Amino acid sequence: MALAKKTIKKVVLAYSGGLDTSAIIPWLKENYDGCEVIAFCADVGQGDEELEGVKEKAIASGASECYVVDLKEEYVKEYIYPILKTGSVYEGQYLLGTSMARPIIAKAHIEVALKVGADAVCHGCTGKGNDQVRFESCFAALAPELTVIAPWREWDMVSREDLLDYLAERNIPCAASLTKIYSRDANAWHISHEGGELEDPWCEPSKEVWTMTVDPMDAPDVPEKVQLSFKEGELVGIDGKDFSQHGAGAYEALMYLNEKGSAHGVGRIDIVENRLVGMKSRGCYETPGGTILMAAYKGLETLILDKESLKYRESVGLEFSHVIYDGRWFTPLAKAQLASAASFAEKLTGDVVVKLYKGMAQVIQRRSPNSLYSEAFATFGADDVYDQKHAEGFIRLFSLSSRITALSQKDSLKDKAE
């Protein structure tokens, strides 16, 4: 392999503690002339269980050291909240839980690499997935001078058995089992599930797929209401508790909503999506807190933004969903779209009540000092602010283009009848 002959002195590996990245450490040292391997692990809220013993595992696999970087608060505050303001939902369903975590992980990865003086970075993404593109696009934007190593595009190993044998031959301990049914990825926003029976789109997900939320059928029979308070587009309170930067903070707010939503089976989706690399894939996602937050935020938008502003913000959200999914966070386009969404969010101050019940998160109350809703205008009864006779002129002008088209093309119903 020509690429493997390139001189690399020090490489920083994005390390999870799993089978793949545990095998990558000795592979790097063997294929890149005994280079020093430093492990980097990003804590984006995947849970203590996932991070338990990760430093020890990395050292046991051959890494010289392991950096575990706590990114939880920054992730929610600087990535999730700005994306929330765009209203981005990929292909109408997916709340982008995996995609939105990649930019901050890539940034922290590069920061560690520059700190230790590495000349390369390495990831464990497969050659079929989206993440290889997302990470490497971010690397290119942040540190184009660094070499990127992607073992799954180089080595000959193709199965979990191959990886386990590789580690066993080198007497490297690994607790991974030969049979792993599902591939999962978790962070503060969500958890994703792929593989196993999910590879057949006609197969219903088993109960074992879902690990974060209660089955909606088993959720409480009594609904629960959650009140969210926003200030200039930022979540600052839930049920009267301060979650602003002066209070418990953004990460704790999301954890609170995750707990509430999970108990009521909120946030489950089972979708087939179009991958960036061209193929379709099926995934099951659990985003309980995010589903509540998105419902509340959009509920506030409908109360405050005028029609044309909301229409434009929705167009930004549609385009930005692809920007995030494709890994283009560190681009001028992303910066412009985030700024646009943030400008609309400045008006979004108010309270929203969301009812949680057996998988449903429904907005049932909303109020704001910036509300454009006027009961006087909206009523169907008599009022002093809107003369219904004025509608006739509006309708005539609104339908003028249709009238002209019909007259010029003889396309009216009368002409057709004749």
Swiss-Prot record:
It is found in: Cytoplasm. It catalyses: L-citrulline + L-aspartate + ATP = 2-(N(omega)-L-arginino)succinate + AMP + diphosphate + H(+). L-citrulline binds at Y94, S99, N130, R134, S183, S192, E273, Y285. One of its GO terms (biological process) is urea cycle. L-aspartate binds at T126, N130, D131. Pathway: Amino-acid biosynthesis; L-arginine biosynthesis; L-arginine from L-ornithine and carbamoyl phosphate: step 2/3. InterPro entries: Arginosuc_syn_C, Arginosuc_syn_N, Arginosuc_synth, Arginosuc_synth_CS, Arginosuc_synth_type_1_subfam, AS_cat/multimer_dom_body, Rossmann-like_a/b/a_fold. ATP binds at A14, Y15, S16, G17, G18, L19, D20, T21, S22, A42, G124. It is an enzyme of class 6 (ligase). Keywords: Amino-acid biosynthesis, Arginine biosynthesis, ATP-binding, Cytoplasm, Ligase, Nucleotide-binding. Its EC number is 6.3.4.5. One of its GO terms (molecular function) is ATP binding. GO terms for cellular component: cytoplasm. The keyword Amino-acid biosynthesis applies. The keyword Glycoprotein does not apply. It comes from the Bacteria. Homotetramer. PANTHER family: ARGININOSUCCINATE SYNTHASE (PTHR11587:SF2). Belongs to the argininosuccinate synthase family. Type 1 subfamily. This is Argininosuccinate synthase. It comes from Colwellia psychrerythraea (strain 34H / ATCC BAA-681).
